[in-house]
Design a protein with these regions (language model features):
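Enrichment for repetitive, rod-forming helical segments
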Residues: 10-11, 64
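C-terminal segment of classical bacterial N-terminal signal peptides
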Residues: 15-23
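Bacterial N-terminal signal peptides that target proteins for export
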Residues: 1-10
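Secreted/extracellular ectodomain signature
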Residues: 24-167
Length: 167
């Protein structure tokens, strides 16, 4: 009887551990879907104008990049900024909402890290968005290349086999 209770208790603890927060994440992998895949090319179209949301997207892009590498897949990422995100990837803080200024520094730091990370082939800023958001090309973070038109760039990447993701 005591042995049955002990076995039941151990089983209950094991089930609880498997269902604990983070347990599924620790066991999750993408082996099945990545079977036979050696490289993934993705163009991320970033328009998020909320600093917290933009920083979150950049963090998840980096997490995805690192996860692919860990699973033996070479990422080829391009990150393209346009729309309201434009104000958060430049240095003129008068263009950034006061409540977003602290996070703008964290965004700049994350972009610096991403620009040096294996698997990130380019980070771009649309000049059409610069004009529409009333910012200046010379204020774009130095790690970001100012291009003519992100739509044209994104179309070109897709024609070269890049998947399109707008997180």
């Amino acid at each position: 009887m005591i042995r049955r209770i002990a076995v039941s208790a151990i089983a209950a603890i094991a089930v609880a551990a498997l269902n604990a927060p983070g347990a599924a994440q620790a066991q999750a992998d993408d082996r099945t879907v990545l079977s036979g895949v050696k490289e993934l090319k993705v163009a991320f179209d970033i328009v998020e104008g909320d600093a917290k949301g933009l920083l979150n997207r950049l963090n998840v892009i980096d997490e995805t990049r690192a996860s692919l590498i860990k699973q033996g897949v070479t990422p080829q990422f391009v990150i393209a900024f346009r729309g309201p995100a434009t104000k958060l990837v430049q240095t003129d803080m008068s263009k950034v909402k006061p409540e977003d200024r602290e996070l703008a520094g964290k965004i700049a730091a994350r972009i610096r890290e991403l620009s040096k990370a294996p698997g990130v082939n380019g980070i771009e800023q649309c000049s059409v968005a610069i004009r529409q958001q009333e910012t200046k090309a010379e204020n774009v973070l130095p790690e970001i290349k100012v291009i003519g038109n992100s739509w044209i760039s994104l179309m070109a990447y897709q024609s070269k086999g890049y998947a399109y993701i707008q997180p």
